Amino acid sequence: MVTLSPAYLPSDGGTQAASAAPSVEENWVVQPSLTLLVLLLVPCVLLLFFLNCFLLFHRLPAFSLRKRASRRKVGQYPCVRVGHSGQARLEPPYMLSPGVVLREGRLGSDTISQGFEATLALEEGVCGRQNTPQSRGSCCQGGSIPSDQICCSPRPRCATPLPCCAPRRAWNAPAYVKKRLRPKVWKVREDELGSSCELDTRHNHVPPNTPAADNALGVTPKVKFCHTSSTQRKSHVGMVPFTLGGSELLEDPSVIPREDTAEHLDASSSLPGPGLDSDFGVSAGISLHILSSDSDSGSQSWTSGMEWDYYDPCYMRRNRLRRDARHNRHLPMMCSKQYWI
């Protein structure tokens, strides 16, 4: 095949010049080809691929060993060995006390929780008396464990605080471990108590059948009540402290101390009460106000600051008694006693 090129034609338009086609070698050298680029990129890609595979397979065993070691450290804890010098030192976590076998494949939640509990027990067992020489058998139960034996197990053997088990750095237990080791406080609900006898500790609001306590300190004693049928029985939990300016609750209503106050014969000197006592009912709540002369009625007693009325146990203050005594000086001095029936 012959191609004609206008460059080889003579200017005068005479003869035609035939030029031969260029060879394959000339086309190979002159024209750039994609084959050369592919041949250069393929070795580079293969080299990078083999290098990546080499690094991956080289680092894979290290990653697996590190992961296995981290799992193993979660279920184990450092052991403490105490020598004859009395100083505690940490041992490798793989050395356990005889009779304790932990399988490496057991990585459940129970093993992890046991490890955390034992580590927390070792942390809490630190005693401040590190300078005092103590034997190993004195801090463990029974004293049968030798002094150079390791003090660690999944369930700690030492029930008392261990002065010899001292960790090197503090460790904060997770929240769920602290919640599990927290002592349980049993709270008795009010509805669990029987309705026939309910123990209720409350502030002493003055019952209708006893005089109110005038406590100088402003603290009312606590009274324990036991409800039986329709009668409410009162008993003091503690003794009421003695106060000079105040008064005292009487333990027994029939026992009434002496008074040096003036009791008047007419009913106008006493304050009207609220009526019969609601605690004893209308039929049984009758109080007798017996007036009797007493030789020692003029004695200065600490109960002279109050006086009982006819029905209700309300009392009159000392200033009220003195004011009534000024108006009624002609009346005789009497001592009052009250009996409940």
Swiss-Prot record:
Subunit structure: Interacts with axin1; leading to promote the tankyrase-mediated degradation of axin. Interacts with axin2; leading to promote the tankyrase-mediated degradation of axin.
GO biological-process terms attached to the record: dorsal/ventral pattern formation; embryonic axis specification; positive regulation of canonical Wnt signaling pathway
The organism of origin for this protein: Xenopus laevis (African clawed frog)
Compartments it resides in: Cell membrane
Main localization of the protein described in the UniProt heading: membrane
Span of the annotated motif VPPNSP motif: 206-211
Protein keywords: Cell membrane, Developmental protein, Membrane, Transmembrane, Transmembrane helix
Residues in the Extracellular compartment per record: 1-36
Keyword Disulfide bond attached: no
Family the UniProt entry places it in: Belongs to the huluwa family.
Protein function: Key maternal determinant of the dorsal organizer and body axis formation in vertebrates that acts by promoting stabilization of beta-catenin (ctnnb1). Localizes on the plasma membrane of the future dorsal blastomeres in early blastulas and binds to and promotes the tankyrase-mediated degradation of axin (axin1 and axin2). Axin degradation results in stabilization and nuclear translocation of beta-catenin (ctnnb1) for activating organizer-specific target gene expression.
Keyword Transmembrane helix: yes
Superkingdom of the source species: Eukaryota
Protein name per its UniProtKB record: Protein huluwa
Annotated transmembrane regions: 37-57
